């Protein structure tokens, strides 16, 4: 038997930054495609706009900092940030919302701290939170899924509404579902209904939950789950953060549902609604802003899952991943300090 002889170091080859970012973008495309199918061409338009602004703004800042523009842009990190912002923003949000959010992510959150590898917050999530607080109306105006919408939005109308604006009556016309009720995301609907005194069973009887999870959102999450599993297979990301998020969210929601099913929604709805799979696989796993050790990544992920459940259930924002990830980013150095692996021959890591 012939053995292959190689010199040290005997380590598996890791991806270059540009290759890693490229793989993340490619694995996210199935989710983007399904999101576009259910919510219209606005998803693609917003993503392309955000990616273009991200590249342009990063190039300008790098030029001002006297850095190599071409080599830095080739790492594809700006493209990924733009993509995440574009798919997180409502499809028919005005163009200036996307531009402001992308500029904030690249210029303030990323480059102001020194560029890739130095930022302490996830740029896309920081931009999303800034936009949500600053422009709550524009950031919560989701259209009805195309399969139940009274007027599905085509490509031309999406362009017109994003770049030239539309009247309130026109927007409402596109937001109306077949039952004549202005549509919101499934999590928004449940949150509003519970505040009005309805039970979860009564809320889940609405048209938006005709498939049991929220029309469109189940398939969107399933597509991002498939892309995330491919990333795990390719070793683009590690499983610890994702597992921590999903396990903590499942356990917390399961306990709540067992205690009071009329007030708390079940685990499956939490896992397959909103941005759960997108955040668990594509956002929270950002190696720059997450914890680094194995135990630290598990704790980091579990913290996000717990925070998401708390904010979704008791807070004012139905989908809480952006807030949860930013809070976990703040805790990452603390987690790393106390979760350092034990050095061989020593009693503890500290």
Curated annotation (Swiss-Prot):
UniProt subcellular location: Cell inner membrane
Cofactor(s) demanded: FMN
InterPro entries: NqrB/RnfD (IPR004338), RnfD_bac (IPR011303)
Pfam families the record matches: NQR2_RnfD_RnfE (PF03116)
Top-level class of the enzyme under EC nomenclature: translocase
Keywords on record: Cell inner membrane, Cell membrane, Electron transport, Flavoprotein, FMN, Membrane, Phosphoprotein, Translocase, Transmembrane, Transmembrane helix, Transport
Membrane spanning residue stretches: 25-45, 89-109, 129-149, 212-232, 239-259, 264-284, 298-318, 319-339
Statement: the UniProt record of this protein carries the keyword Metal-binding: no
Keyword Membrane: yes
GO cellular component, one term: plasma membrane
Gene Ontology biological-process annotations: electron transport chain; transmembrane transport
Membrane topology category: Multi-pass membrane protein
NCBIfam families found in the cross-reference section: PRK00816.1, rnfD
Known function: Part of a membrane-bound complex that couples electron transfer with translocation of ions across the membrane.
Family (UniProt): Belongs to the NqrB/RnfD family.
Subunit structure: The complex is composed of six subunits: RnfA, RnfB, RnfC, RnfD, RnfE and RnfG.
Name this polypeptide is given: Ion-translocating oxidoreductase complex subunit D
Species this chain originates from: Shewanella sediminis (strain HAW-EB3)
The organism's taxonomic lineage, starting at the top: Bacteria, Pseudomonadati, Pseudomonadota, Gammaproteobacteria, Alteromonadales
